Amino acid sequence: MNRVVYVQPDFPVDAFAGTATYYARYRVPYPAGLLKDLITRAGLTGAGRLLDLACGPGRVALALASSFQEIWAIDLEPEMIVVGQHEATQRGVHNITWMVGKAEELAAPPASFVLITIGEAFHRLDQQRVAQHTLQWLQPGGCLAILGGYGPWSGTEPWQRLVAAIVRHWTSHHAAHGAVAAQPQPGSGPDHNERVLRATGFVEVASYPFVVPHDWTIDTLIGNLYSTSFCSKRVLGDNAAAFEAELKAALLAHDPSGTYSEQMRFGYTIGRKPS
């Protein structure tokens, strides 16, 4: 059945408060092969304008900065924008306009972007509204790309199941604030995203997976978890130290090497505005 069930987001406005520095440092970058593939499929030439919706600290905007004359990057969390601006300055990137606000409420002129990206955020947005807006904002032949990746708690390695169980325990029973559930969620994933794009009027809709090897340490795992809305230091509150201690002890008991390997799954769904 191909009926589209649009997500009506219920994430708190401050769901990512306090996560921006962890996000910039500990989220694994999108694979170079994925970005190169996106550039090729979108037909980017180094000209035109990119819009990065729900941009976080600018992981997509910064990675694609050299492929555009101008970039708009918008996120609801002010700390994300501050960290993104700092990262841009450190990298010598000066073609990004940073904005604080909701993707759903952005006022953008029609037919003004050659590519619009949404990285690991489409499940948190009003999908029907955002998809319709992006179709209006794109130039004819321009593309919308929804990028995503799976966190270290979502894989099938034994150590990942261990991490998931500990995270679930602490965020279900000990959280200082209401924890936001981890993916997968209704209204997320490539198949769903494809249905949304087709229903909106995009053509040439397809999804492309990328798998890359990655080695975690205990510190980078904890930093990555602190970059999430459901296991941030703010969510854990005074229990953060106890959470860290239990996670470290469990991982070292499982594998005392302190290195934990996985095949990380990334991907993107792309659709083109009819010419």
Regions found by a protein language model. Give the residues of each.
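Conserved catalytic/acceptor-binding region of the Class I
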Residues: 135-212
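A short acidic, Gly/Pro-enriched loop at the edge of an enzyme's catalytic core
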Residues: 106-115
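Conserved class I S-adenosyl-L-methionine
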Residues: 2-45
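Class I SAM-dependent methyltransferase SAM/SAH-binding core
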Residues: 49-51, 57-105
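Conserved Class I S-adenosyl-L-methionine
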Residues: 57, 184-275
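A short, conserved alpha-helix within the catalytic core of class I
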Residues: 125-134
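A short beta-strand submotif of the Rossmann-like class I SAM-dependent methyltransferase core
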Residues: 115-118, 127
